[in-house]
Amino acid sequence: MECDKNMSFEDCELAVLRSAVDKIEKQTGRKKIENPEVKEIINIVEDFLKKTQRICYGGTAINNILPEQDQFYNKDLEIPDYDFFSPNALDDAKELADIYAKVFDDVEAKAGVHYGTYKVFVNYIPVADITYMNKDLFNAILKESISVGSILYAPPNYLRMAMYLELSRPEGDTSRWEKVLKRLILLNKNYPLHGVDCLNMNFQRGFELENKEKET
């Protein structure tokens, strides 16, 4: 990173520092993702998702249903953290942890902060967040889910709803808002809402029936 002539000394220092941080993070991320153990960890959770047909949501889901040019995660540098819904969340957490325990020594499955959510860690790496979802609701979302590489992801409208909900809570974690909005813009770009123009709809029949009911 070269400093611009118009930069102050302090701004130049910051620019050099940011460039160094980016370089180090890329090197560290590449080392992690190329580690055979990390590759095995990712393969196991992805195979579990393919087998059980659970529905992924969250950042990884948004990223993976976007076209490659709009994806915000660099798969060569970042370890995916899968969040997924399950009608049997506790059992899934136990089963996934048992699968990992056959291969790795440091495996932990524990309850999350929110009721009905369970976290699975392998070698201190967060691998999965499993959230309970009522079976009827799960099946309804399942019908509109998107399959990418045999892994199911929540439909765009559900992901969109979750992001709008987060942006509507000023007493929540506002430090995430900028990141959430960037993702929302990308989702809306690739999966735009198609509204109905109410001005072109004919409501006359409905009004006629309503008037007849009042007369009787």
Give each language-model segment a name.
Residues A20-K23, I99, V103, R183:
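Charge-rich, solvent-exposed alpha-helical interaction surfaces
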Residues K31, N35-K39, S86, L90, ...:
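Generic detection of long, well-ordered alpha-helical segments
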Residues V38-N88:
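Active-site nucleotide-donor binding segment shared across nucleotidyl transfer reactions
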Residues L49, I130-T216:
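Active-site and adjacent loop segments of nucleotide-processing enzymes
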Residues L90-A97:
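Short, conserved charged micro-motifs
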Residues D98-N139:
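Conserved catalytic core of two-metal-ion nucleotidyltransferases
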